[in-house]
Amino acid sequence: GFGSLFKFLAKKVAKTVAKQAAKQGAKYIANKQTE
């Protein structure tokens, strides 16, 4: 049904956002360490 599709999409988006956030965080930490 529609609910399960929405849940599936929400999970995908959450995973993508988490990946992006992890990348940004790693970059930020690396920049802080090189200062």
Curated annotation (Swiss-Prot):
Cell location: Secreted
Tissue occurrence: Expressed by the venom gland.
Positions where Glutamic acid 1-amide occurs in the chain: E35
InterPro entries for this protein: Cupiennin (IPR035164)
Keyword ATP-binding found: no
Coiled-coil stretches noted in the UniProt entry, renumbered to this chain: none
Pfam family, one: Cu
Keyword Membrane found: no
Main localisation: secreted
Alphabetically ordered keywords of this record: Amidation, Antibiotic, Antimicrobial, Cytolysis, Hemolysis, Neurotoxin, Secreted, Toxin
Signal peptide start-end: none
Function (record text): Has antimicrobial activity against E.coli, E.faecalis, P.aeruginosa, and S.aureus.
Protein family membership: Belongs to the cationic peptide 04 (cupiennin) family. 01 subfamily.
Annotated protein name in UniProt: Cupiennin-1c
The organism's taxonomic lineage, starting at the top: Eukaryota, Metazoa, Ecdysozoa, Arthropoda, Chelicerata
